[in-house]
A protein has these predicted regions:
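Extracytoplasmic soluble-region selector
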Residues: 1-101, 121-124, 134-150, 164-167, ...
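A generic structural motif
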Residues: 67-69, 114-116, 154-161
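Beta-strand/beta-sandwich contexts
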Residues: 101-115, 204
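Short beta-strand segments enriched for Tyr within beta-sheet-rich domains
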Residues: 170-172
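Short acidic/polar inter-strand loop motif in beta-rich domains
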Residues: 177-180
Length: 243
């Protein structure tokens, strides 16, 4: 008789690793009234992950389903993000402060003029809302005028009473936020005309503009010049060209 074949059985073991659910928020922690900032989760999760956002105080800041936070009134609120994958979940929070204005950038355009990027209801800005101070001497330079761009309300121009041409570092503070810039040294590095193309039969003012090495306007002189420091002439002879 034939011997019966032996049956061999092998046991295979698979280990399935399940990544833990994670959530961490990135985004601005300061937002102006009426403006928005987007919070996003920086942790990688399953495509099945569902994230929800809530605000501790909707009267200060609201948050949409996609993490967009809108400033309502000045104050502080805590945004909570909860991510869920199946039965697993994770939660994190981010504190957000709502201000009347948020100062993002500041730069010098002329010796007595600064340009700033500001969010908020900028049409209500006043010269006294800004503090311009020399970091070394702590001397404050008052702002005489605030102008808001008619097409882009976030572009704000500050006119100062005094020229800043000492190459010093200055602080500009608005609603508790401070940005810095280095002032011009007041040395002329280039000279040119502000308008090099003029429409035919159209009266157009032409200015001689001198700038420092960083492009800050040191001086503007209108033609014809009455300034003893600069002398320039315009030759109107030729075939449509001037020199």
């Amino acid at each position: 008789t034939k011997k019966s074949a032996k049956t061999k059985t092998k046991k295979l073991t698979y280990t399935l690793k399940v990544a833990k659910v994670g959530v961490a928020l990135s985004g601005d922690s300061v937002v102006a009234i009426g403006s928005t900032t987007k919070l996003t989760n920086t942790k990688k999760n399953s495509s099945r992950a569902k994230i929800t956002y809530t605000s501790s105080d909707d009267s200060i800041a609201t948050v949409a389903a996609d993490g967009t936070v809108t400033g309502v009134k000045a104050g502080k609120a805590t945004i909570t993000a909860k991510i869920t994958v199946g039965k697993d979940s994770a939660t994190t929070t981010k504190d957000v402060e709502v201000k009347n204005y948020v100062l993002s950038t500041v730069a010098q355009n002329k010796l007595t003029e600064l340009t700033a990027t500001v969010t908020g209801n900028t049409k209500n800005l006043k010269p006294t809302d800004f503090v311009v101070k020399n970091e070394t001497t702590n001397v404050v330079y008052p702002v005489s005028k605030v102008s808001v761009d008619s097409k882009d309300a976030s572009k704000v121009t500050l006119t100062l009473f005094s020229e800043l041409k000492d190459a010093a570092t200055y602080d500009v503070t608005l609603d508790g936020i401070t940005k810095t810039f280095v002032a011009s040294d007041g040395k002329v590095a280039s000279i040119g005309l502000d308008n090099v193309t003029i429409p035919a039969a159209t009266e157009t003012e032409v200015k001689l503009v001198s700038k420092d090495a960083n492009g800050v306007i040191v001086k503007e002189v209108s033609y014809p010049s009455s300034d003893s420091t600069y002398d320039f002439t315009i030759d109107t002879k030729g075939n449509g060209y001037t020199s």
